[in-house]
Regions:
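Active-site proximal beta-strand in glycosyltransferases
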Residues: 4, 99-105
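Glycine-rich phosphate-binding loop signature in dinucleotide/nucleotide-binding domains
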Residues: 72-79
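Short His-centered aromatic/hydrophobic patch
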Residues: 83-91
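Alpha-helical elements of Rossmann-like donor-binding domains used by nucleotide-donor carbohydrate transfer enzymes
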Residues: 22, 64-72, 91
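Short, Asp-centered acidic motifs that coordinate Mg2+ and/or phosphate
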Residues: 79-80, 104
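Short hydrophobic signal-anchor/transmembrane segments that target glycosyltransferases
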Residues: 24-26, 95-100
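Hydrophobic packing residues within well-ordered alpha-helices of enzyme cores
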Residues: 45, 92-96
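N-terminal strand-loop element at the rim of the active site
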Residues: 6-64
Length: 105
């Protein structure tokens, strides 16, 4: 089954994160994988049985974040990235362009 990566740069369960959790729990054609902005949010997704990773989204260390995302994409054979805010969209676009990945953003 194809995998979809959800990028959530925050570390708390608020509006967009709740919506992402609902989307992930109800996905039928894709297996969700989530990258969160911290352990707290990552643990919530793991409790729901959703594969989840955590990292720090920082403009100072953006290349570290991009390498982390690239490794997750390659490790899990991700085909689609769903970004849930502006920061996530920028990171998704940059990881695709920087590493020339064949993914849909």
């Amino acid at each position: 089954m194809k995998k979809c990566l959800h990028i959530l740069p925050m570390n708390k369960l608020s509006g967009a994160e709740k919506m992402a959790l609902l989307i992930c729990k109800n996905m039928k054609k894709f297996t969700p994988v989530v990258v969160c902005g911290g352990k707290n949010l990552s643990e919530i997704f793991k409790k729901e049985g959703i594969e989840s990773y955590d990292t720090t989204f920082s403009n100072k260390n953006i290349f570290k974040t991009l390498r982390f995302l690239k490794n997750i994409i390659e490790k899990n054979n991700i085909k689609i990235i769903h970004a849930h805010d502006n920061n996530a969209s920028l990171n998704a676009y940059l990881v695709k362009r920087t590493f020339r990945l064949d993914i849909k953003v």
